[in-house]
């Protein structure tokens, strides 16, 4: 792996690779045009991925307050909930209310996870900016997650694409296809490069706007990140935008993010206080911590557009409703060093 100094230079050289410019991508009016895009784009997933696996229901008001604070910190994309049946994931029984509130924030793109075309139709009707659809590279994990084969889920993605295309051009949300267990599976073990590329190819052929590679159970290493990203780029071509969704299960989350930067990735998912995990992946717990990721990137000279002081305020909201054992983050323990220049 290249040194951090080299990575910093590489970040500037590859700045345009994989960036979306929001004025052309998201149709919902924004409060003000961006002066320039940040070097690295972070999607905050705590309101959805961070809460879905909790065995306690977080009050609707708290979810809305969390989203408010995240948006106020300058985060430009928020995964705000999932349009799934409440009996499957009770945490999102209030998704319609939460999503309506989230969409009042014009400075951020608001996205939602959907498991099928019915969920997509609800998300489209709600007016979301982005729809996230997951297919596992692992057949076993896909069956556990959505009770469908990989082939059946690919057909489901095509149906979602068709539902979006049926809307007027100005009312079509962006569609991201996420490949779960891209770097290993707690149910199957190793996941082959071919299995990941198969799903990536299906997403590209169905005209996904973006493809996400998810380290669902935190088994990735920096070397493996580079290998899989390179393989997927060969499969779908350099014009496809890729993002990484990393977990810190085994402590390699930030190292894997640096490997992603070296591989040309400029879009990452993360969760405040490291919330999250997959309810159908035994042993998986904890997305990479947004606060720690922002600090690292800014220290590397890569802008995120996020006000770290404001982002840290999310901990107070979470601590009122979520047990401390679920809340992590080095920056919360050590505090923000004076050397960090504000990203605001």
Positions of predicted regions on the chain:
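Catalytic cores and adjacent flexible loops of soluble metabolic enzymes
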Residues: 20-344
């Amino acid at each position: 792996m290249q040194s951090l100094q080299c990575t910093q230079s590489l970040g500037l050289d590859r700045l345009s690779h994989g960036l979306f410019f929001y004025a052309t991508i998201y149709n919902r009016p924004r409060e003000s045009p961006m002066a320039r895009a940040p070097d690295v784009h972070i999607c905050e997933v705590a309101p959805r991925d961070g809460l879905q696996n909790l065995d306690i229901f977080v009050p609707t008001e708290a979810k809305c307050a969390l989203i408010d604070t995240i948006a106020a910190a300058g985060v430009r994309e928020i995964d705000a909930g999932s349009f799934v049946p409440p009996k499957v994931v009770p945490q999102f029984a209030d998704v319609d209310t939460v999503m309506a509130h989230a969409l009042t924030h014009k400075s951020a793109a608001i996205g939602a996870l959907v498991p099928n075309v019915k969920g997509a139709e609800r998300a489209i009707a709600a007016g979301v900016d982005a729809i996230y659809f997951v297919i596992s590279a692992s057949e076993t994990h896909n069956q556990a997650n959505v009770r469908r084969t990989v082939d059946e889920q690919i057909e489901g993605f095509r149906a979602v694409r068709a539902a979006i295309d049926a809307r007027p051009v100005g009312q079509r949300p962006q569609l991201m296809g996420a490949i779960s267990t891209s770097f290993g599976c707690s149910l199957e073990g190793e996941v082959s490069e071919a299995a990941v590329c198969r799903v990536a190819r299906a997403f590209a052929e169905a005209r996904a706007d973006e493809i996400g590679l998810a380290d669902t159970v935190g088994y990735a290493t920096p070397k493996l990140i580079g290998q899989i990203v390179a393989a997927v780029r060969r499969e779908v071509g350099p014009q496809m935008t890729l993002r990484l969704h990393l977990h810190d299960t085994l402590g390699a989350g930030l190292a894997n993010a640096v490997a992603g930067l070296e591989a040309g990735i400029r879009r990452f998912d993360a969760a405040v206080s490291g919330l999250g995990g997959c309810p159908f992946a035994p042993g998986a717990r904890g997305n990479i911590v947004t606060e720690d990721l922002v600090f690292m990137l800014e220290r590397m000279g890569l802008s995120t557009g996020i006000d770290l002081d404001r982002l840290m305020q999310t901990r107070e909201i979470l601590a009122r409703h979520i047990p401390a054992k679920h809340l992590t983050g080095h920056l919360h323990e050590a505090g923000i060093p004076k050397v960090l220049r504000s990203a605001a």
